[in-house]
Each structure stands twice: as structure tokens, then as C-alpha cells.
Amino acid sequence: MVVKVGINGFGRIGRLALRRIQEVEGVEVAHINDLTDPAMLAHLLKYDTTQGRFKGTVEVKEDGFDVNGKFVKVTAERNPEDIQWADSGVEIVLEATGFFATKEKAEKHLHPGGAKKVLITAPGGNDVKTVVFNTNHTILDGTETVISAGSCTTNSLAPMADALNKNFGVKGGTMTTVHSYTGDQMTLDGPHRGGDFRRARAAAENIVPASSGAAKAIGLVLPELSGLMKGHAQRVSTPTGSITELVTVLEKHVTVDEINEAMKAAADESFGYNVDEIVSSDIIGMAYGSLFDATLTEVTDLKDGGQLVKTAAWYDNEMSFTAQLIRTLEYFAKIAK
């Protein structure tokens, strides 16, 4: 049985989600809703500066385009309640506009003629289950209609924080993500639509301090760490490829080797383990949601006998998150009731 998916918002994550779904059996994109002309959407799907050219075929048709020979309907409705997802057989919507990222707003897709379930591709708030696949996906029971996949940084941070807490106990911590610039920043100095003075500055010419909700969101993924972490971002002049640095105080005394061994033992399809001296361009396009870098682990002994432990994990803030998103989508569809 094929699960048909709709995508609302065909931006960076929406387009990469369609690419990733081409590699998944039993899931296909049947309908895209975006206010942009289908010919432009098809062009941006086919050609991508950071992720490379689409390996399949894309052909513009009336009212949509063919992707690898299969028709994808394209509509341009502003309001979710006006999108007739059911006409395309869509069961699950990927809400990727960024504008309908709360439970109340996302539920507008569930109207008569709409979809059955929604997966938000952004943090969704306290009343929505936030899923980082292979960290806490088993919190889902199949009855949920709206869930969130969190953010790219949350998916980078969560498995690393989880491994630290399970093995050594986390008393508290602070994280910094050195994050590539995104479409929410200005390419040249100019007014920012959200009123952010720093994001109003030229993205490729500056280090831009910015907020990050990942440290707060970690409490939605790992409730035992709720309120124990703070964090922020430093946006830098790379188009994709980011790294999360986490500094923690642990309950146990540790060594660098003990930390690295715990991370190696926790590795899976979502959480990789690296011992090479890599840089950000080396992880573009990778499928790990988070890649722990054992070469960057540090343990600092303090005068009072305590320790500061620094760990780091790479992530492609575009494709790493998308890979995790689609893993969550597959699971969400599989357990649906």
C-alpha cells in the first residue's frame, strides 16, 4: 500500500523532502501547495546550489509536474482549509510553510476534503508531540493527528544530550550552534521582515548572533532535561553545513575516552560517529540527523573538583533534518490508527 503525501510550502525543506521520498518505498508525493508558479517550483526542484542537481526527471505539465514519471498536482491556496488534499488521495501533509506551525493552525488541513494527519517541519509548541527519530519516536501511539519533527538543531542536539544523560547524568548545560545562514536572513543589509536587527545584516558577510529554540525544545523531546539547558546560534557565511557544541556539567566524573565510547555505542542511522578531522562541506547531503565528532570532545577539570564537558555534532541543516523528517513520516504512516 502506498501512502500519499502532500507538501504545503515548497521551499528548502519541502523540495528536499520530495527528493528524499523518491528513495522511500511505499510513500509518494501526490500534491504540492505553494503560491509560486509550477514552472518555477519544478526548476528549483531540478537545480539546487547546495545539494546538487536532482538525479531524477522533472517535467512541467498543466496543473503540476511529473517527477520520475509520476504526476504531482500543484495548487496555490493561501489557506489550508481551502486545499482539497483528498482529491489527490493525500493522507499525510508535510506542513513546511513555517506559517502554520502550531497545532491549531496545522489542524486546518484536517477539514472535510483535507488530509488525515499533519507532520509539521518546524517546532510545534507544547501541545504537539515533538519527535526526533531514534531518540523519542516511540512516544507516538498512532492516534495523533498533528505532530512536529522539531528543528534541524534539535535533531542534532537531542541524541548527543540523550547519550550524555543516560550514561553520566546531565546537571545542566549550554549549547551553541554554528549555523549556516538561511532564507530568513538578508543577503544584503536591509529591513528584516521580523524586525530582527542582526538578521537584517548581510548574511554572507557577517557572523550573526541569533536565537535558537533547540535548547528549550530539548525538554519536549527529553522531558528529564526540561529547563536544564540554554542556547543560541551564531549564523555564519556558509550556505549549509552546521555544528552544535554542547557544554555540560555531568553527575559523574568522566574522561574524553569515556564520553567518546558512550557516543560510539549510541550510534545508529540517525546519529553517526566520526573520528576524522572534517569540515562543514564534508557533511553536506548526509543522511545522519547528527554526526558526533570524537575529535572535538574536551573535558576541563575545575578548581572545585567539578568538570566542564564539551561535545560537538555536525549536521547538514537542510538534508540531515530532511532525512530525519522522512524517517518520522514513514513511522507516522506505519503506526497510524
UniProtKB/Swiss-Prot annotation:
One Pfam family per UniProt: Gp_dh_C
Tagged with keyword Kinase: no
GO biological process annotation, one example: glucose metabolic process
Principal location listed in the UniProt entry: cytoplasm
InterPro entries named among the record's database cross-references: GlycerAld/Erythrose_P_DH, GlycerAld_3-P_DH_cat, GlycerAld_3-P_DH_NAD(P)-bd, Glyceraldehyde-3-P_DH_1, NAD(P)-bd_dom_sf
Keyword terms: Cytoplasm, Glycolysis, NAD, Nucleotide-binding, Oxidoreductase
Subcellular location: Cytoplasm
Pathway(s) where this gene product acts: Carbohydrate degradation; glycolysis; pyruvate from D-glyceraldehyde 3-phosphate: step 1/5
Residue(s) at site: Activates thiol group during catalysis: H179
GO molecular function: glyceraldehyde-3-phosphate dehydrogenase (NAD+) (phosphorylating) activity; mannan binding; NAD binding; NADP binding
Residues the record lists as binding D-glyceraldehyde 3-phosphate: S151, C152, T153, T182, R199, S212, G213, R235
Family: Belongs to the glyceraldehyde-3-phosphate dehydrogenase family.
Name of the molecule in the record: Glyceraldehyde-3-phosphate dehydrogenase
Organism: Lactococcus lactis subsp. lactis (strain IL1403) (Streptococcus lactis)
Gene: gap
